[in-house]
Every structure is written in C-alpha cells, then in structure tokens.
Amino acid sequence: MIDLNADLGEGFGRWTLTDDDALLSVVTSANVACGFHAGDPSVMRRVCDLAAERGVRIGAQVSYRDLAGFGRRAMDVPSDELAAEVAYQIGALRVFAEAAGAPVAYVKPHGALYNRTVHDEGQARAVVAGVRLAGGALPVLGLPGSRLLTAAAEAGLTGVPEAFADRAYTAEGSLVPRSEAGSVVTDEDAVVRRALAFAVEGSVEAVDGTAVAVAARSLCVHGDTPNAARIAARVREALETAGVGIGAFA
C-alpha cells in the first residue's frame, strides 16, 4: 500500500499554479500551501472543500515566510520563531479543513525548509515543536533518514518517509538540488518507471547510475511540473496495474 501526495493550493489572488481540481481526482493526500510560500484564505478554503468532498486527506504544507521566493530560498530563522510560524500555518489551514468537515491529517515542510530539515537538527526540532504547539500528534512527511523524521520520532510523532518520482537522487539518497541541471525529471515515462521502482522494488536509480534503497510510504508527484495532473494519473494507473494498493497513510 502506498500513498500518493501532491502540493496543492499554490496560488494566491488571481495567480494560479497547480491544477488542483484535476490532481484531487488522482492523489490520496493533498499538501495544501498555508500562506507563507503560496496560498491565500480563499485558495486554502477552496482546496479544503474539494479535498473533503473527494475523500482526500488534507495536510499542512508549511514553509519559511517567503512568498517572493516561493519558499525555495534558504533562510536562517530562530527556532522559537520557526516553531511559532509552523503552528500558525497549521492553525490557519485547520480552520478551513474543519469547516469542510475534515481534519488536518499531517504536516509536510515545503521547499527550502524541507531540504534544511534533512540535515539541520535545530530546524528539524523547531518544525516538530511547531507541530506539537499546534495541538495533536500529527504525522510528519519527510525524506527517509532525515533529521526531521528522527526528531518527529523522538517527540512521539509518526514520521512518514516519502519518495519523489519526479526528482533526481544522489547516490547518498538525497535530492539533487534544484539549482543543478537534471534535478527535476520531466520525461513522463521516466517518472512512471521511477514510481514503480519506488513502490515495487523500494529503490531508484541515482544520477550516477547506482541503485539507491528508498523505503517510502508515500509518493510525491509535484503539482507545479508540466502536465502534472496527467503524469499523476499515469503513475496511479501504472501502480494499480502492477497490483500496488493506493491509499492514504493518515
């Protein structure tokens, strides 16, 4: 059994980026932007309404406060401040999720914050502290072996390892930085093959050609890549054809 997640609600005002309606017909978990890198109250409400209507689990996609940089710029935020900002974002999304009759079911950092918490124990602990501050014991999505998942487990939270079908991996099992050529896999057939490899074999081919073991409970297909909805649909169809069960982890 594997979960399919995608980043949704990444727009604000008259600007839109992701095809939320189409993706919500495919994925089982929606990482909803909470206003710090994208998303505004109207967008958050609409995505929560659609997700609840279709039985898709709602997750808080928390970020550094970086609208101009789409949450992808490296920042140094004091731990107490970051914890408060994470809790704030979860709380904001919770209002709209509960109004739609659904809970916020998990938390996933976005962009630079996600990458930072792979190696930075202080920032990882701050994210976990923010999850705790927001109340409940929400699962946390992160890269296998990351400081974030370790910090979550130490705090009594469930750490959920995920894989990225449309991102390139290093031989060490980390994501190739977006600043490097080839970091995003855009060939649709390749994305489908990689998704199957993750789900069936528990591994993926790294940029140097070696096989990297990746034990994932959730598979991410980014919503902001070209033809994202079509790729996600192809991934789901291929997984189901291979006999892989599809279902939310939370």
From Swiss-Prot:
Top-level EC class as recorded in UniProt: hydrolase
GO terms, molecular function: 5-oxoprolinase (ATP-hydrolyzing) activity; ATP binding
EC number from the UniProt entry? 3.5.2.9
Kindly state a single biological-process term from the GO annotations of this entry: carbohydrate metabolic process
Write one Pfam family the protein is assigned to: LamB_YcsF
Its keywords, alphabetically, are: ATP-binding, Hydrolase, Nucleotide-binding
Q: Which InterPro entries match?
A: Glyco_hydro/deAcase_b/a-brl, LamB/YcsF/PxpA-like
Q: Which CDD domains match?
A: LamB_YcsF_like
Q: For this protein, what reaction is catalysed?
A: 5-oxo-L-proline + ATP + 2 H2O = L-glutamate + ADP + phosphate + H(+)
State the similarity comment: Belongs to the LamB/PxpA family.
- Could you give the subunit structure recorded for this chain? Forms a complex composed of PxpA, PxpB and PxpC.
Q: What does this protein do?
A: Catalyzes the cleavage of 5-oxoproline to form L-glutamate coupled to the hydrolysis of ATP to ADP and inorganic phosphate.
Q: Which PANTHER family match?
A: 5-OXOPROLINASE SUBUNIT A, UNCHARACTERIZED PROTEIN YBGL-RELATED
This one is known as 5-oxoprolinase subunit A
Biological source species? Streptomyces coelicolor (strain ATCC BAA-471 / A3(2) / M145)
Q: Which gene encodes it?
A: pxpA
